[in-house]
Amino acid sequence: LTDFYQIIHHVPASPSVRTLMQGWLIPKHFQGQLRMQEGITVNGHYLPMSAPVPADATVALHYQAPMPTIAPAPGATDIVYEDEQLLAINKPAGMKTHPNKASDTDTAIARIGQYLGQPAFITHRLDMATSGILLVAKDPLSQAIINRQLATKTAARTYTAMVDAAIPDCGTIDAPIGHMGNDTRRREVRSDGLPAVTHYQVLTRNAAYALVRLVLETGRTHQIRVHLAHIGFPIIGDPLYNQTPGPRMYLHATEMTLTRPFAPAQLKISCPPTDFMV
């Protein structure tokens, strides 16, 4: 276990330490650990969870958690956002988010670890063939806060894809997704699958292709890829769901909206694709 310290300045008044923790979306198991170890101090003094927090206080959190063990790897990282708790990069297509086997040494998370000088904490994943915003946390508490926002849909991700020009202007794809037979990689729409909903809108189009904005209500594996293929408009270059090959799969994580850990401010991270041919 590694010791972590979180110091938050200029905290607004709160009826109790517990209310403050809940407002920060700190998971209950972290709250329990902080309470048991007296790891919460307000203006330098320990306060019980029921005690009020004065205005403009400095709150320090001390806790222990495992440190990720992914080894750092040298390589360029295209950083699109960074603050004290979070880092977002523009992941290139063709790079894995994290290693799946021992030989996977050059991954996005390994390069981020090299840049930070410490391992990063994963909050979500992108398929190897998908480019765009990949957000990590610099500490386990911020990771837990972002994961909770993603799970409760208070954080939102927007994608851009390139498909055949004939796709309708907009639509909602509400179709359950499950494994394709015994294939461990591929998914398909099937009645016994998990619920999956994708909204799409055409942004622009030319004679050959349409640029489509996509918002997910659910987060199934390959959801966008499977849903677009299901309605007859697979992503251009998709190696699993489009029989026509391309130079890359034209799917990009374009935008992410969330609440910053330990701050009331909404954060919007944007990273438009630069190589889509529309």
Feature locations, PLM:
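RNA pseudouridine synthases
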Residues: L1-V278
